[in-house]
Amino acid sequence: MCLLHISLPYLSCALLPGWYFDARPAASIVMFAAAEENDDPYPGKSGYNDTCELMDMDGAVASFDEGMLSAIESVYSIPTKKRLALPPPKAASPGALYQRLQGELGFPEGQTLLSAMEKWNEDMFSALPGHVDLYTEIALLSTSVDEVVRAGLDSLPTPSHYSPEVDLNAHGDEPFPEVPALEDDLEIYVISAQRFYLSELRTREEHYARLLRGYCVALLHYLYGSAKRQLRGSGSDASLMHKFKQVVRDRYYREAANLARLLYLHLYVSVTREVSWRLHASQVINQGVFVSLHYFWAQRRKFECLFHPVLFNHGVVILENDPLEFHDLQRINYRRRELGLPLIRAGLIEEENSPLEAEPLFSGKLPRTIGFLTHQIRTKMEAYSDAHPATPLFPLAEHSYSKRIGGRLSYGTTTEAMMDPPSPSAVLPGDPVPPLTVGVRQTAATLAIPSNLTLQSMETDGLDYSSMTGDELNQMFDI
């Protein structure tokens, strides 16, 4: 067995509310060449003739439903154009700011998806990078009420524009990967696809962080006016500051978290849609090369993650050391359809006359998808205070994205924070993400072929085609 180790900055992980472990973003990708011996592993619907020993690769990929080539794919077939954000919002009620943000993002389904995720169990977010470094200097997100109040007063009056500008369709520097013609180049392709996605996500989040700050400023200015109105013009400056701090403590953190939840759900879903449909458009017409790819998800959360660099896993697919089962594929495809993402295809395990999707069952005893998203957001919004340890720790128990302090729960703590881990050996979102491992079937480029070996010499030695499996024949003709 030939091993090739390639460094890969794979998706880092976040933590589930209430469970705290160190996240380790580094990972590697391991490519190995392994000869497979399968007698017609794609029977029936997948396009292979049961009476023919030679695998018909073109027929196999042609049989896959191309109904996924839809209007959605055509929209994302090219990079999205620059789309500048509206001017920073002025002071307005939390409800008005929420509606404005939803309209500015063009995300009418946002609240519906957030509500639906209350009844989902899939971990779609903990394998995504947190990018907490983007938030370490945003004092408006401090867990200290005093610091938030000072930052809010310093931001008066409301700026007329963002500086630098906020582009809601900002793109990264990585080039879009093209599907290789040869399976020998698959490992490079998988690395490139992931790098492209991570670059797009990172760049877009830089702009979204500035957008969040603009909405937090507007929210604070509204709360400042609310404090003034409650005093009705009476009282000293000290009374006004006391009232303002009380209003911030009671309302700011909760409302800021609501805005952030909508904003970052849109970030993750929109970037993943764009990249995934572009990948789908290029992969769907080149599916044959992926028959040689062996894909391994060491943890279920990596399989449930929003982003998949390969959408046509027609080779061997392994989930947590066992062959991927069709019902698992159906369930994750059901969620992907709800999110507007292309389905994952896997020719070896798909069953004839069976739908590609099946609704997953929900368990109230397991963590919820909204909890994974909420904690991903918490890691960002707590970054300022984590980076400035002089900040008092006690306000952590006062706001809606707080951690557990001495076992106490804040009013905004999610259900997940009150739950014990599913089992002592369960993989938690804060655990290190293991390396992504994919394998490539041996080809002419990876096999050590004797220089004097020819097809004629093999026939002279008594080669019998009728006794060879289709995969063996494919390898021989590759040679």
Swiss-Prot record:
GO terms for cellular component: host cell nucleus; viral tegument. Keywords: DNA-binding, Host nucleus, Host-virus interaction, Phosphoprotein, Transcription, Transcription regulation, Virion, Virion tegument. Its main location: virion. GO terms for molecular function: DNA binding. It is found in: Virion tegument; Host nucleus. One of its GO terms (biological process) is regulation of DNA-templated transcription. Associates with the VP16-induced complex; binding to host HCFC1 activates VP16 for association with the octamer motif-binding host protein POU2F1, to form a multiprotein-DNA complex responsible for activating transcription of the viral immediate early genes. Transcriptional activator of immediate-early (IE) gene products (alpha genes). Acts as a key activator of lytic infection by initiating the lytic program through the assembly of the transcriptional regulatory VP16-induced complex composed of VP16 and two cellular factors, HCFC1 and POU2F1. VP16-induced complex represents a regulatory switch: when it is on, it promotes IE-gene expression and thus lytic infection, and when it is off, it limits IE-gene transcription favoring latent infection. Belongs to the herpesviridae tegument protein VP16 protein family. This is Tegument protein VP16 homolog.
